[in-house]
Amino acid sequence: EDIDLIIVGSASPDYPGFPSTACIIQDRLGVMNAGAMDLLAACTSFIYGLETAKNFIAAGSAHRVLVIGAETLSRIANWNDRDSVLFGDGAGAALVVANNENETSGIIDSYLRAEGAGAKHLIRKAGGSRSTFHINTAEEDLYLKMNGRQVYTFAVRALCDTIKILCERNGVSHDEIKYVVPHQAN
């Protein structure tokens, strides 16, 4: 009852569009007064969810936001394509809560970027409005297609750049960082 908003980040939701996975979770938790939305930003959906939660709280629109990241990409992996089976299933959650003005804990900063030009390197062709599921859909279009080497190279470069930018922006040295929980660079 004390959750104001549920954000679920996933590239493999329970259903394609309706109902949202967040609404299913809202019902199961019995928090009927909470807003609920799915957020899709591929592998970074959970991070975008945290940033969205932070901004809802900063705007005063919410005080307690449940952010969930969940993937079951094994269900859409082409197990015959060695470049595309480097995924694992899993889920994690965080409760983001408005803190007192005197507290210094929480989300300090974030740096969100995307690589739209790389869409061809990680794609599932069927299932969207551009190419709906149909009896004549080519079987390979039902599965995730990935250029593993390209995706890995991009992810490692992006992570290194992001750490550098965030450290510079916040006056933090690399030595002061205790933990980095990175994206799984496949």
Where are these regions (language model features)?
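Phosphate-binding/catalytic loop of phosphoryl-transfer enzymes
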Residues: 53, 58-82, 90-94
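Short beta-strand segments
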Residues: 9, 40, 65-71, 96, ...
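Glycine-rich phosphate-binding loops at beta-strand->alpha-helix junctions
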Residues: 9-17, 177-186
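Condensing-enzyme catalytic core mediating Claisen C-C bond formation in acyl metabolism
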Residues: 73, 80-153, 157, 161-164
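Phosphate/pyrophosphate-binding loops at sites that engage ATP/ADP/AMP, CoA/4′-phosphopantetheine
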Residues: 1-4, 161-178
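Catalytic nucleophile serine of serine hydrolases
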Residues: 43, 71, 184
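Conserved catalytic cysteine-centered active-site region
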Residues: 11-65
